[in-house]
């Protein structure tokens, strides 16, 4: 039986070798978003669904949502449910006078829909005046973040004549190669906003759909509305500021072995995790396992491959 067949039949819960386990999806710890700093206020809020392929060996896919806040000075694009979980956690640990603000923020988006997960780990702050992008990422099993700043990336688009209607807007097709992935997007010239999703830029209209040629990422717009929301940074989140090269190397290493130096080590001084990561075919009462950095492997599916 091929590796692909093993993964598919196991539903993603499996070990290639006895005692070596692979997580089914990243496990992000909540951030504490105390004392947020307001950078701008949105005029437009856009929500996207994202359908993600978890790895090249499996047919398993999972959904998340991305929220983009578009203001006069800044555009912020981030994983909605990862952020909301942090907001909820912050409300729980807040002082009495701060709790109502975070409770209100969490309740605004309701509960995470069934079938959706906290997969998108990035916060992309695009400064329109400085023409710079701050990339801030959560890491599996860590409360700290990593970040780097770069100029707004240059994307060289081929704009096609093909059109289609999305949410009542006539959209045009465009394609580009960017850092290891080939992207096809649909943008709406009627909404003259450069970008809107992630760090896509250089098109004369809001991104309505985007998909990678390898099928790992499919973004589809859900809603667009005129809405004021604070675009905030979170200075109390412990953050490592790195070069892009160091950022990518560290992120890859953490995803590959999330337990090593993770939250259990940081908060309990232990380099192992006790849990119930059941693999396909094991008895249901097999509920206690000890995972170490050498026996618990992660998945890595970055937006940028280069």
Q: What residues fall within each predicted segment?
A:
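Structural motif
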Residues: 166-167, 178
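Extracellular or lumenal secretory-pathway regions
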Residues: 2-154, 160-163, 170, 216-306
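Tryptophan-centered motif/residue detector
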Residues: 156-157, 186
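Gly/Pro-enriched, hydrophobic low-complexity segments
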Residues: 172-235
């Amino acid at each position: 039986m091929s590796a692909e067949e093993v993964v598919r039949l196991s539903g993603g819960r499996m070990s290639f070798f006895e005692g070596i386990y692979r997580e089914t999806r990243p496990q992000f710890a909540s951030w504490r978003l105390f004392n947020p700093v307001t950078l701008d206020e949105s005029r437009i809020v856009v929500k996207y669904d994202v359908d993600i392929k978890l790895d090249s060996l499996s047919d398993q896919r999972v959904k998340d949502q991305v929220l983009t806040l578009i203001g006069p000075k800044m555009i912020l694009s981030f994983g909605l449910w990862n952020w909301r979980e942090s907001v909820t956690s912050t409300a729980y640990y807040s002082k009495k006078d701060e709790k109502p603000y975070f409770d209100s923020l969490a309740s605004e988006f309701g509960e995470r829909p069934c079938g959706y997960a906290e997969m998108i780990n990035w916060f992309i702050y695009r400064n329109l005046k400085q023409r710079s992008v701050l990339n801030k990422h959560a890491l599996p099993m860590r409360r700290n973040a990593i970040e780097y700043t770069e100029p707004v990336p240059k994307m060289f688009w081929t704009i096609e004549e093909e059109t289609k209607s999305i949410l009542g807007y006539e959209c045009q097709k465009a394609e580009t190669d960017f850092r290891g992935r080939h992207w096809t997007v649909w943008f709406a010239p009627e909404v003259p906003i450069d970008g809107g999703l992630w760090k896509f830029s250089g098109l004369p209209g809001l991104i309505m759909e985007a998909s990678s040629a390898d099928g790992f990422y499919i973004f589809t717009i859900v809603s667009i509305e005129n809405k004021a929301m604070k675009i905030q940074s979170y200075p109390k989140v412990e953050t490592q500021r790195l070069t892009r090269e160091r950022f990518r190397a560290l992120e890859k290493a953490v995803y590959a072995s999330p337990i090593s130096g993770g939250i259990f080590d940081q908060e309990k001084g232990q380099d192992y995790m006790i849990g119930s990561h059941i693999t396909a075919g094991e008895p249901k009462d097999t509920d206690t396992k000890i995972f170490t950095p050498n026996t618990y492997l992660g998945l890595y599916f970055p937006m940028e491959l280069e």
